[in-house]
């Protein structure tokens, strides 16, 4: 509802809030999956209105979705095919109209190892993986400079939901590395610990509006943040 904020380069901006207060709609609009009725989303001064969803995902942002089974992976195919959608135009992986399968398998095996995906090989079906390893496949595709050109914005929507502490720690570390490399990171989470641990600054969504903004999280407490999330403070 008329929200306005900026994600700066080299910053993790956390979006806190009880679920159902506009987070899903916000993410859908930023990623181009929901059309904008009014206003705009610009990434490095480029309006997403001028881009297709594919162009947004290829050129402007990486996206780790909350629902990895619906939006993050194709569970009925192998790890390799889930890692390569951004590589289909690269000449080093093409032979005319055909893809170089051996080169892609080698890359996928190496990236899976880099991201500590526990699997037999990149030919294993994603649907056979644990939730944590499935999330690592999503992270490898979206966050590795070997599988894509890293865009200026990373959108991480509940990135640790339903995964073990090892996978959570791994993905958190990757987000921090990308922030330190100069990317802007938009972190949406209902987990107060995750928000406070990772975010440099925080906005709170309540009833579709920004109820609080904290430019520096170093002195922000769970209690204070929770009051804004519940609408006690605005």
Name each region found by the language model.
Residues 1-234:
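Glycine-rich phosphate-binding loops of nucleotide-dependent enzymes
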């Amino acid at each position: 509802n008329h929200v306005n904020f900026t994600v700066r380069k080299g910053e993790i901006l956390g979006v806190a809030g009880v679920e159902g207060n506009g987070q899903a709609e916000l993410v859908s609009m930023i990623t181009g999956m929901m059309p904008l009725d009014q206003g705009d989303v610009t990434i490095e001064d480029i309006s997403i209105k001028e881009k297709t969803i594919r162009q947004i995902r290829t050129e402007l942002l990486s996206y780790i979705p909350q629902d990895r089974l619906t939006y993050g992976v194709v569970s009925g195919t192998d790890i390799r095919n889930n890692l390569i959608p951004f590589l289909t135009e690269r000449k080093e992986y093409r032979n005319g109209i055909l893809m170089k399968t051996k080169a892609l398998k080698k890359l996928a095996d190496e990236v899976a190892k880099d991201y500590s995906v526990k699997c037999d090989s990149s030919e294993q079906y994603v649907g056979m993986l644990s939730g944590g390893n499935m999330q690592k496949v999503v992270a490898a595709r979206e966050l590795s400079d070997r599988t894509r050109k890293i865009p200026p914005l990373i959108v991480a929507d509940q990135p640790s939901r339903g995964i073990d502490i090892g996978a959570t720690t791994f993905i958190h570390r990757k987000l921090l590395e990308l922030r330190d490399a100069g990317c802007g990171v938009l972190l949406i989470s209902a987990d107060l610990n995750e928000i406070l641990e990772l975010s440099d600054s925080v906005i709170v969504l309540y009833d579709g509006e920004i109820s609080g903004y904290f430019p520096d999280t170093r002195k922000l407490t769970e209690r204070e943040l929770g009051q804004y999330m519940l609408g006690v403070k605005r």
